[in-house]
């Protein structure tokens, strides 16, 4: 599976939006695959929840939404290498108090560089989702402008991208 992901990372260089989402059920091997890519490309993985969370702790809660984008931009600029950014644990981006649209945020980053991100949701019927309907952080998106890379069977095989 790492070979297919490596090829995809090389192939998306010429696309307008260079966003690849690793999608699969919990414990399917998404993070392990991202770590493999990190080791092969010598690019660190940005743990968004830990890194951004630590930065936001220094900002008063009433002002965090004003600083989240700038802090995240600084973190991604520090972490990206050779036009490649690897992201994991992005759940914090869905925090409603930050007033972010996580997918649009990722797509904006993917115009300037290739972004490979573990998606903490699912894709079904051509729709990308995070959370369950009725949950306060539930999000539902179309898949235009991104490349889904589905992982199933505990990471042992991948399903063709939609």
Specify the residue positions occupied by each region the protein language model found:
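Hydrophobic positions on the alpha1 helix immediately C-terminal to the Walker A/P-loop
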Residues: 33, 37
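P-loop (Walker A) phosphate-binding loop of NTP-binding proteins
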Residues: 25-26
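Conserved P-loop NTPase "ATPase switch" module shared by AAA+ and STAND
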Residues: 80-98
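Hydrophobic anchor at the beta1->P-loop junction of P-loop NTPases
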Residues: 22
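Short glycine-rich substrate-engagement loop in P-loop NTPases that contacts/grips substrate
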Residues: 51-76
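N-terminal pre-Walker A segment at the start of P-loop NTPase domains
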Residues: 1-13
């Amino acid at each position: 599976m790492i070979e297919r992901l490596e090829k995809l990372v090389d192939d998306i260089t010429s696309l307008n939006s260079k966003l690849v989402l690793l999608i699969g059920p919990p414990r399917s091997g998404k993070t392990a695959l991202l770590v493999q890519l990190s080791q092969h490309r010598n690019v660190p993985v940005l743990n968004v929840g830990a890194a951004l969370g630590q930065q936001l702790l220094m900002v008063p809660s009433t002002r965090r939404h004003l600083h989240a984008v700038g802090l995240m931009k600084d973190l991604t600029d520090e972490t990206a290498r050779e036009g490649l950014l690897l992201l994991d644990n992005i759940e914090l981006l869905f925090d409603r108090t930050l007033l972010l649209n996580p997918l649009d945020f990722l797509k904006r980053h993917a115009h300037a560089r290739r972004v490979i991100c573990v998606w903490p949701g699912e894709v079904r019927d051509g729709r990308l989702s995070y959370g369950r309907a009725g949950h306060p952080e539930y999000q539902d998106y179309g898949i235009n402008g991104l490349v889904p890379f589905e992982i199933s069977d505990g990471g042992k095989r991948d399903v063709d991208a939609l």
